[in-house]
């Protein structure tokens, strides 16, 4: 009897283990998707509600949509109609809202200036202007804009864009800012005298921003302690202002997402991941490897090296999967949900993506067990093939 029982018991145990393994595999988390709908800036929407709904309906047949980020036209009726459709399908709708830039059409905000009190080159040349990140009136103006123009449109949350200073798109003046009197006081409270920073730059030039060490995950270490202190303080100052706005939106019962630069470039624009991820429901780091325009990782890094050619220690960086994984590793410990932004739009000269590139990026993200992807940056114009590959 014992001899008969042992093989039966062994077989039964194996069946249980096999079923357990099979069940575990079937329960592997599937990626969730956030899509963005760009309908124009403050003017009449570039798409009708019916066009947007039809597009979202077709996309939802290819992939599961969890959230839709839409903005930032002032047409309330579009949001109400789209929101009604989304809520019928248990999809959250978030307002796409810029914080520190592109608000001059609707708000009287004070501008950001470099450490010499000058408007950075990007705005002087006709680009959009960035605003001071510490002026309390600037912050309250954006909250007031939401309350006046969007609070009755059915939004479940707000996705804050432009939560940074200028980048090297504006040259060195884009990152050595803001130097207004208010920001000067904030830097002083962080132990940084901006007069000393100005003097160091004027004396050392590009070498002031040299780095002594680079690690793909932990980022750059500045050779000059004053440069390190400046960017540490800048990250605290800008990110704490963003946190204050996020907290105010949370008090209104809203979910909050943040649009972030890739971790290796974030310190230059004042984004401290540790602070920001504690005040957001989710972050969308822009891990754009194929974008040859602002926010593209390679594009921004090339601008850095061109802006400070005399700085030492900046290595060649290949925008391959290994580098993508280093950026995913850098944000792995952030306590909020993580939806890396992967570009799915296509334009031969600016964003030459492919279905293979999109699928490759998804695979890397899911190896880190992140929540999913933010499909950037306008689902209305993305090729279907770049979406369908995600559902396979």
What are the residue ranges of the model-derived segments?
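Boundary/entry segment of secreted carbohydrate-active catalytic domains
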Residues: 26-55, 343-345
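The substrate-binding groove and active-site-proximal loops of carbohydrate-active enzymes
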Residues: 41-45, 65-73, 124-143, 224-239, ...
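Short, acidic/polar
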Residues: 43-61, 137-149, 265-276, 351-366
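Catalytic domains of carbohydrate-active enzymes, especially glycoside hydrolases
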Residues: 45-78, 152-157, 282-286, 364-374
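Active-site-adjacent "subsite" loops/lids of carbohydrate-active enzymes
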Residues: 83, 94-153, 170, 239, ...
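Aromatic- and acidic-residue-enriched carbohydrate-binding clefts of CAZyme catalytic domains
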Residues: 103-133, 171-228
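An active-site-proximal structural segment forming one wall of the substrate-binding cleft
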Residues: 130-169, 173, 248, 273-276, ...
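Glycoside hydrolase catalytic-domain groove-lining segments
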Residues: 191-349
């Amino acid at each position: 009897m014992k001899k008969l029982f042992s093989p039966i018991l062994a077989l039964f145990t194996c069946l249980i283990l096999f079923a357990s393994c099979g069940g575990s595999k079937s329960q592997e988390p599937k990626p969730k998707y956030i899509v963005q709908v760009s309908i124009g800036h403050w003017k009449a929407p570039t798409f009708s509600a019916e066009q947007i709904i039809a597009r979202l309906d077709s996309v939802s047949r290819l992939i599961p949509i969890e959230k839709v980020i839409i903005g930032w036209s002032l047409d309330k009726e579009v949001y109400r109609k789209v929101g009604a459709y989304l809520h019928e399908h248990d999809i959250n709708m978030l307002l796409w809202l810029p914080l520190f830039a592109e608000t001059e059409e609707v708000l009287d905000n004070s501008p950001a200036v470099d450490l010499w009190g000058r408007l950075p080159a990007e705005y002087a040349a006709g680009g959009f202007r960035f605003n001071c990140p510490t002026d309390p009136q600037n912050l309250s103006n954006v909250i007031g804009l939401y309350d006046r123009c969007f609070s009755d449109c059915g939004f479940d949350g707000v996705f804050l864009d432009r939560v940074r200073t200028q980048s090297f798109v504006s040259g060195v003046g884009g990152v050595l800012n803001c130097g207004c009197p208010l920001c000067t006081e904030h830097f002083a409270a962080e132990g940084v005298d901006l007069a000393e920073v100005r003097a160091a730059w004027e004396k050392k030039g590009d070498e002031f921003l040299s780095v002594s060490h680079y690690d793909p995950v932990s980022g750059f270490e500045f050779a000059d302690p004053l440069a390190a202190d400046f960017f540490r303080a800048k990250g605290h100052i800008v990110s704490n202002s963003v946190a204050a706005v996020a907290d105010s939106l949370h008090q209104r019962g809203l979910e909050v997402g943040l649009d972030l630069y890739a971790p290796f470039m974030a310190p230059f624009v004042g984004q401290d991941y540790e602070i920001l991820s504690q005040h957001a429901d989710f972050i969308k780091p822009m891990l754009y490897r194929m974008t040859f325009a602002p926010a593209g990782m390679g594009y921004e890094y090339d601008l850095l090296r061109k802006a400070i050619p005399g700085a030492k220690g900046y290595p060649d960086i290949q925008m391959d999967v290994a580098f993508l994984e280093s950026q995913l590793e850098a944000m792995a410990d952030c306590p909020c949900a993580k939806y890396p932004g992967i570009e799915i739009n296509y334009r031969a000269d600016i964003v030459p993506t492919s279905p293979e590139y999109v699928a490759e990026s998804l695979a890397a993200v899911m190896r880190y067990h992140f929540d999913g992807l933010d499909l950037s940056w306008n689902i209305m114009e993305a090729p279907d093939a770049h979406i369908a590959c995600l559902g396979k």
